[in-house]
Amino acid sequence: MSSHVPSFLRGTPDMTAHGGDGKSRNVAGLMLAAIGVVFGDIGTSPLYAMKETFSGPHAVAMDKGNILGVLSLVFWAITIIVSFKYVIIIMRADNRGEGGSLALLALVSHAAESNRRLSLMVSALGIFAAALFYGDSIITPAISVLSAVEGLQVAAPHLEQWVVPLTIVILFVLFAIQSHGTDLVGKMFGPVMLVWFLTLAILGIRNLSHAPSVLAALSPHYAISFLFREGWHAFLALGSVVLAVTGAEALYTDMGHFGRLPIRLAWYLLVLPALILNYFGQGALLIYNPEAIANPFFNLAPASLALPLVILATLATVIASQAVISGAFSVTRQAIQLGFLPRMEIIHTSEEEMGQIYLPFVNWLLMCMVMVLVVGFKTSSNLAAAYGVAVTGTMVIDALLVGTVMLLIWKWNPRKVKWLIGGFLVVDLAFFLANSIKIPDGGWFPLVVGGLLFTILTTWKDGRKRLLARLKADALPVEDFLASLSDRVPRVPGTAVFLTGTSEGVPIALLHNMKHNKIVHERVVLLTVIVEEVPFVPEERRLENRLLAPNFHRVFLRYGFMESPNIPKALAHARTDQLGFFYEPMSVSYFVSRETLLPTEKPGLRGLRDTLFATLARMATSAMDFFHLPSNRVVELGSQIEI
């Protein structure tokens, strides 16, 4: 890392970007890649942010004073929330290079485990932030693509009635190609978004020349005077101003893919200047041409370039949507690995990049929800009301979680933390409260989605915890099992691997195999997969073998929450001295237990949660598919458990 880079941009020395081959790539290449993935959401906000402030349901009067006031609010919101809070502060709180709500939750939970009350509060906040992310993942593709296609109203007014149908077609194609991966088209994301941000800057500069006086709005004086002068109307305007910072959390979430330094450099050198120039260009346009408020972004360009701009904007919003969809896949895998969701089918779409995954269930569910939003809300203006609630809610939670990191992990001075986080919360809560006014107009949607997913995430986590405790309590101790083994029990050649979720006792599948088949394999392995609260586990720590008796092993396979467990691959890669025996794939049989959960009648909420847990368990992907076990070597034994 070059010595001329300012220290506040560098991050900690251990911060590296990791791809599928685990090798760091050059900073310039990572910057270009980050421009194509990380900044899609915030980079397409100019399509609708200014328009909503002056023409939305809570619009403010459009005079020069108010335009300067709104521009000042936009500039300082981006400066405080994105440039300072996320880029400088929150991006320092990585979990071994990974960012995002669940990675931050895993980091903080470990530090707070000695304080039960704090641990529960932190867990609830982190889980709700992850739940809100899914609401954002549904809204972003809908509002982004819709706002781009709405440019046809300027470029080709006679096609206005085709805005919604075209949006649906574009989104359907986007979701349909997910199963094929984005390896090929993904290489175009960076160059396309580079052209997009340069276009934003050029359009802004072109219009600034007509009213350069708008640059005075860089002074916070205009933001403060606007708030005091307009009062309630200015407060409501915050609900639209916050649209300029939607996507800020992506800088933190995608940190593991590109590294801290490339994201920071891309932000300060390209994305931030382009956004500010474009917003101020829109402000200048509205001063000298108030009629442009119908769609200020597309009116920045000459009429002859309106259609090419619509095409470029559509490409940019598709890329932004792709980044959000890929993020939903990644967060879902994290949630599964950390025990917040049942197993789902995870398909790797690239042999080189292990981060490129496809989850069919998540993909088609997202598509259906996005289509419902487009058809139901019809315009980006209507969707804007739903957008801000999820974003501002996540911003508040991120501030609280990073404050916990400052106190428990970084050991910062409590007074310093109080003032810093307090300042962030004043800004975040102001935006959140302004957006809460929009709840009846569509803001209810991300809250409903977040509430449903919070219930699912917590129900599964709590249910698995209680189920494993029950299995552990009922399990026969290994010592008793070994002592009860008679020499008369036939031993058959080969190795039997019994998967078990607990690290103690004998798996139910082993007892059932003994009961029904009356045999024991010459070598028995009790295998438990453990997911640690880190993104990746080094290969040298992957496998741990404990010899419980001659030819009777307990094996632990450790993975991080960003990895997909592959049991046969892990066993094949293990050394013979590490594993304790020679691994021969064709001599191994895998035994898995499939529990059928039977909820008992319980009054109130507990009964409903038990029923939900049992339903989720039935929907879970089989252990055979999830752990990549060869189907012709698997024996599945069922059991019924009352909960």
Curated annotation (Swiss-Prot):
It is a multi-pass membrane protein. Its main location: membrane. It catalyses: K(+)(in) + H(+)(in) = K(+)(out) + H(+)(out). The chain crosses the membrane at residues 27-47, 70-90, 120-140, 157-177, 185-205, 231-251, 267-287, 300-320, 357-377, 389-409, 419-439, 440-460. PANTHER family: LOW AFFINITY POTASSIUM TRANSPORT SYSTEM PROTEIN KUP, OSMOTIC STRESS POTASSIUM TRANSPORTER. It comes from the Bacteria. Keywords: Cell inner membrane, Cell membrane, Ion transport, Membrane, Potassium, Potassium transport, Symport, Transmembrane, Transmembrane helix, Transport. GO terms for cellular component: plasma membrane. Transport of potassium into the cell. Likely operates as a K(+):H(+) symporter. It is found in: Cell inner membrane. The keyword Transmembrane helix applies. Belongs to the HAK/KUP transporter (TC 2.A.72) family. One of its GO terms (molecular function) is symporter activity. This is Probable potassium transport system protein Kup 2. Residues 1-20 are annotated as: Disordered. The keyword Electron transport does not apply.
